[in-house]
Swiss-Prot record:
InterPro entries in alphabetical order: Ribosomal_bS16, Ribosomal_bS16_dom_sf
UniProt protein name: Small ribosomal subunit protein bS16
Any Pfam family hit: Ribosomal_S16
Keyword Nucleotide-binding found: no
Species this chain originates from: Buchnera aphidicola subsp. Baizongia pistaciae (strain Bp)
SUPFAM superfamilies to which the protein is assigned, alphabetical: Ribosomal protein S16
Gene3D superfamilies per UniProt: 3.30.1320.10
Keywords associated with the record: Ribonucleoprotein, Ribosomal protein
PANTHER family assigned to the protein according to its UniProt record, in alphabetical order: 30S RIBOSOMAL PROTEIN S16, SMALL RIBOSOMAL SUBUNIT PROTEIN BS16M
Family per similarity comment: Belongs to the bacterial ribosomal protein bS16 family.
């Protein structure tokens, strides 16, 4: 089964996540098929978290049967809400 999920990177207590397409049998930080975005939760006190998602690729993979994790679903909702406010 193909899933859209997060891969944790970064230093201790300074996480940085890649949003990837991966087979569910692979480990969390293991091999993945495609990188479709990133999420930086801790930039600094003055800056909000940064989210970048390629929505075209997400829709492509969902149409082909990929399943999003709970956290990725929340990030996609936040990303679409931010884009609507900017436009």
């Amino acid at each position: 089964m193909v899933k859209i999920r997060l891969v944790r990177l970064g230093a201790k207590k300074r996480p940085f996540y890649k949003i990837v397409i991966a087979d569910s049998r692979y480990p969390r930080n293991g091999k993945f098929i495609e990188k479709i975005g990133f999420f930086k939760p801790l930039l600094s006190i003055k800056h909000p978290p940064q989210i970048c998602i390629n929505t075209l690729r997400i829709t492509h993979w969902i149409k082909n049967g990929a399943i999003m994790s709970k956290r990725v679903k929340k990030l996609v909702k936040i990303h679409s809400y931010i884009n609507k406010k900017i436009k």
